[in-house]
From Swiss-Prot:
Location in the cell: Cytoplasm
Keywords: Amino-acid biosynthesis, Arginine biosynthesis, ATP-binding, Cytoplasm, Ligase, Nucleotide-binding
Full protein name: Argininosuccinate synthase
Enzyme Commission numbers on file: 6.3.4.5
Organism expressing this protein natively: Corynebacterium jeikeium (strain K411)
Listed GO biological process terms: argininosuccinate metabolic process; L-arginine biosynthetic process; urea cycle
Pathway this chain belongs to: Amino-acid biosynthesis; L-arginine biosynthesis; L-arginine from L-ornithine and carbamoyl phosphate: step 2/3
Alphabetized Pfam families for the sequence: Arginosuc_syn_C, Arginosuc_synth
Amino acid sequence: MKDRVVLAYSGGLDTTVAISWIAKERNAEVVCVSIDLGQGGEDMETVRQRALGAGAVESIVVDARDEFANDYCLPTIKANGMYMKEYPLVSAISRPLIVKHMADAAKEHGGTAVAHGCTGKGNDQVRFEVGFANTAPDLEIIAPVRDYAWTREKAIAFAEENGIPIEQSKSSPFSIDQNVWGRAVETGFLEDLWNAPTKDVYAYTEDPGLGQAPDEVIISFESGVPVAIDGKKVTVLEAIEELNRRAGAQGVGRLDMVEDRLVGIKSREIYEAPGAITLIRAHEALEAVTVERELARYKRGIDAEWSNQVYDGLWFSPLKRSLDAFIDSTQAHVTGDIRLVLHAGSITVNGRRSGKSLYDFNLATYDEGDSFDQSMARGFVELHGLSSKIAAKRDLAN
């Protein structure tokens, strides 16, 4: 009986060619796993049939949209997850979910190995392989693109030589990864840092300069979870999809950044994440109202480390699990409504309300009704600056 290899199948050129290559080079049967993460585009049944046409003995499609939203996007919202303060971890949070379902498929279908189509330059090889090391350490890992130095030209030539049906051509300029949380675009002419993105780079967002009327939206949260938009109850997935549509129509969520990859190189990336960025900005605004000052300050550092852990492929690490527990504990009072305006590529918060708010109007106002006892301030200022005052006195004496 032949060994079985479970392949993470995207439907693209590299993983389509990998089916035949693994079957020939490893004398193995290939089981393809494709995950619906709300990426849109090609119908998943078309993707499944392509895998079978390329030689897979089985092709499995998993509808993981709600799971992705609830178990991967939602923790990112609670952690205000932004790598390098910009990137909302579009690809990074999807990889551990793919790993989970591939490990399940290997167990169910008798797989002895798993395979992916990642290159040796990217972060995803780490995310996949460290993920498997944590969830299914006995599985062999096959990485033909990386380990056999595949190029696009070599993959196309192999497909033509072996009669593999592919629709992709050498004219496709970009490498694209997308899901409901966002879209990542790289390579092609974008590798020259001076080249500005052209209109065809974007798909999730409209041109911010088109002059649409502003869109005002109210996002409601309960314990850090988005539960309603403009008063209408939504699931997490529905919240992301609705804000992808509305924020995307306003050109919100475009990023053009040079990113520090885990492997040590810098890479230019174009991202579109209208729903993700809108939800994170709204969540940050509500935390500013409901989370105590010292806790909020400390959480910002935890959020940054959480983002680093996830970006670096350590979703399953003990540290990341501990960070999850801390972050969840901070969300008990993050309940309320944030009103914001989406317009011309920008997000402007213009309203906040919460029954858990720490904002006290009578303490904050400078007008009549002020209940803040300003006589306490003098002593507070003296004590607050005492240690630095003593140090300054010493330094001046020397």
